[in-house]
């Protein structure tokens, strides 16, 4: 199948069948508008408790949707027809923390001791941004979202430690404010941004070269806005070195049967004023950038 084909209007069941039959292996950004998309982390049961606690301690980077019992391939909470071993466009396989290979299904790798964690994804709030009149650059350019390793530390838990990975979308200052307001409603899709403005403040030295995904144009009147990202566990896995782990490939998500709106916590009519919103979201704000938005006073 042509990976450049727009799939926004394709019914979810048809899209899932394409993925299951290895006919679509591309990024799912912009696909199945309005449906919750999810990251996957699959670990041996002996590592599962520590990772569960890691997710609980780091809900922005790893917003937990659900977790399976060992060996289970299905989760009724996210979809009656979803097979966790076939319904992701591409999986990444790690041994001792090192990436080994990419596969399109897990039939030869599945084990009865494997526990699957389903984590929320920022692709889930894309439709809300678009419905509010905002443009998402990577979708407009037909690309995967830009993702970066950072210097922002996660809270450690047992065997697991490491730094955030973030996704980036550029906006004008006015649109950035609106994007912050909208995405705060979706904590299970990473919620409000963790940073905007100068990327070097979070350890990104070259914004034109993402660690994952694709580079997009950032116009002179735009600022980069950074959200927590479900690729964070892959960064953590490289440091924590479990003997075996499977994840989704960055930008190639599990699309669930649940609507993103089911996980919204705040009606858009009742959004707080931005200064209070930022305080409550605990955002990292570059005050120089904040001054240009009228948010910071020295």
From Swiss-Prot:
It is an enzyme of class 4 (lyase). One of its GO terms (molecular function) is lyase activity. Keywords: Lyase. Its EC number is 4.2.1.-. The keyword tRNA processing does not apply. The keyword Lyase applies. It holds the Pfam family D-Glu_cyclase. This is Putative hydro-lyase VFMJ11_1458. The lineage of its organism: Bacteria, Pseudomonadati, Pseudomonadota, Gammaproteobacteria, Vibrionales.
């Amino acid at each position: 199948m042509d990976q450049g084909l727009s799939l926004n209007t394709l019914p979810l069941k048809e899209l899932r069948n394409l993925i299951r039959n290895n006919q679509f292996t591309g990024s799912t950004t912009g696909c199945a508008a309005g449906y919750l998309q999810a990251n996957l982390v699959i670990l041996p049961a002996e590592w599962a408790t520590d990772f569960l606690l890691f997710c609980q301690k780091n809900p922005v980077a790893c917003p937990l949707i659900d977790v399976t019992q060992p060996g289970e391939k299905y989760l009724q909470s996210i979809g009656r027809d979803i097979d966790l071993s076939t319904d992701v466009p591409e999986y990444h396989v790690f041994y001792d923390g090192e990436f080994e290979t990419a596969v399109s299904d897990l039939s030869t790798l599945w084990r009865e001791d494997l526990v699957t964690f389903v984590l929320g994804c920022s692709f889930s709030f894309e439709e809300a941004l678009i419905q509010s009149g905002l443009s998402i650059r990577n979708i407009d350019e037909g690309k995967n979202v830009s993702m970066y390793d950072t210097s922002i530390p996660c809270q450690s838990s047992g065997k697991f430690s490491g730094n955030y990975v973030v996704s980036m979308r550029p906006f004008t200052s006015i649109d950035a404010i609106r994007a912050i307001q909208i995405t705060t409603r979706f904590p299970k899709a990473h919620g409000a941004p963790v940073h905007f403005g100068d990327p070097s403040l979070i350890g990104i030295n070259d914004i034109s070269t993402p660690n994952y995904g694709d580079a997009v144009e950032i116009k002179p009147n735009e600022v980069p806005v950074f959200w927590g990202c479900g690729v964070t566990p892959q960064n953590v896995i490289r440091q924590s070195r479990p003997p075996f782990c499977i994840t989704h490939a960055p930008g190639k998500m599990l699309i669930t049967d649940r609507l993103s709106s089911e996980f919204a916590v705040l009606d858009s009519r009742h959004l707080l004023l931005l200064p209070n919103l930022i305080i409550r979201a605990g955002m990292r704000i570059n005050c120089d950038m904040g001054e240009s938005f009228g948010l910071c006073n020295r």
